[in-house]
Amino acid sequence: MSAKIRNTFSAAMFAVTATTSAALAPAGYAQTVSDTVSFVNFENREVGVYGNAEAKEDFKRNDYDKSWWYAMDKNNGENSKVVYDGEEHGNVLQLKYPKGCVGPNDNDTPACAGQIIQPLVKTADTMWSAYDIFFEDGFEFQLGGKLPGLCGGKCYTGNAMPETGDGWSARIMWRKDGNAVQLIYFMGQESVYGDDFKWDLNGTIPQKQFTTGTWHRIVNKVSMNTIASPGNGDKNGRVQTWFDGELALDVDTLRLRDYDTVKVDKFYLSTFHGGSSAEWAPTHDCFIRYDNFTVSTDSIAVKAGAPDTTAPGTDRIGAQRQDRLNATPAKAYRIDGSRVGGKKANYEVKVGR
C-alpha cells in the first residue's frame, strides 16, 4: 500500500496517536476511532486551491446546529491552498495573510486567511484539540493575530462579553514578537475583548513564542466548570495548553458557563491579523501552514509519536511530569501493522487496543 493511500485511509478513519491510561501506554497503543471527533490532515487533497467545498467535506459538522459557516474562498481563492511540505508533513493547508489585511472581514482591506466554525458531531464537558503550525519565513507578527481554538454555546468573540453564562471561547493568539497567549472569553473577564493568559505557566517558565521556519505543535484541553445551580456556575473551569510538548498554560478558575447545557461543541478555525486598526496589519503578504487538526474526547499526545503525558492525575506540574515528558516515544505503526517513522505515520492508527 502506498504512503499516499495509507494517509488518505488514516484521515478517513479520523485517526490519531494518543493514550488514555494513567500509566504510560504500551507501544502501539492508539486512540480509537470513537474517541476522535474530527481529524483533518489534507492527505486526501490534491495540491491547489482549498475552498469552501473542500472545507465542508473535511471539517465535518453535526446535522442539527446551523451556526456553522465556512469562509475559505477569500480573495478569489488566493488565501487558502493545499501545498506539499515535504516527506515529513506531506500535504498541508497554507493560508495567506495579505499585505494590509486586518480582521476576518473584507471591508476596505484584503480579507485575511480563512474562517471555519465547525459545530462538532459530538459535544462534551471536556474536549481536546490539537494542530501543527508553521509560520513561514518573513511572517510579520506585528501587534498580534488570532489562531484556532475551541468554543461553546454562543462562542463569544470580538467585543461581545458573555454576561448570561450561555457561551465562551478559548482561541489562541500570537502577540508582538510571536509571544503566545490564550484569549479566553468567560464570565467575569476584565476586558471587553477577552482576557489574555500568557503561555508561561503562571510565570514559572519562560514565555513561549512562535518562531518562523519551525513546525510547532499545540495541544489544548478545555474542561467545563461545574454548576452550583441553574444560572450559577462555579469558578472551576479549566484550560490547559501544551506547546511543543511542554505544559505552558494551566488555569482552573474560569466560569465558562452558568448552565450545564453549555458544552465544548465547536472548533473555531479563526485566524487573521488583528485587532482592527492598521498597525496590526502586515506590510507584505505572509503565510502560515497548518496540519493535523484534531478534536477528541480523549487525551491527545502532546508530542507527535510520544506517549500521552497528560493522563488523569498527572497533567498538572508535579514530580511525575518531567519523567513522563522524557519517556521513550511510543512506536508508530502503519495501517498494515508495520513499524514506521515520520510524522504522518505517528498519527495513523493500529485499530483496537
Predicted regions and their residues:
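Intrinsic disorder/low-complexity segments enriched in polar/small residues
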Residues: 5, 32, 183, 321-323, ...
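Generic low-complexity segments that are intrinsically disordered, proline-rich and/or Lys/Arg-biased
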Residues: 11, 27, 32, 105, ...
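C-terminal segment of classical bacterial N-terminal signal peptides
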Residues: 16-28
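Bacterial N-terminal signal peptides that target proteins for export
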Residues: 2-16
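C-terminal outer-membrane/trafficking sorting elements
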Residues: 311-353
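Serine/threonine-rich, low-complexity intrinsically disordered segments
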Residues: 7, 19-22, 311-312, 316
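Low-complexity, Ser/Thr/Pro/Gly-rich disordered linker/stalk regions
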Residues: 29-308
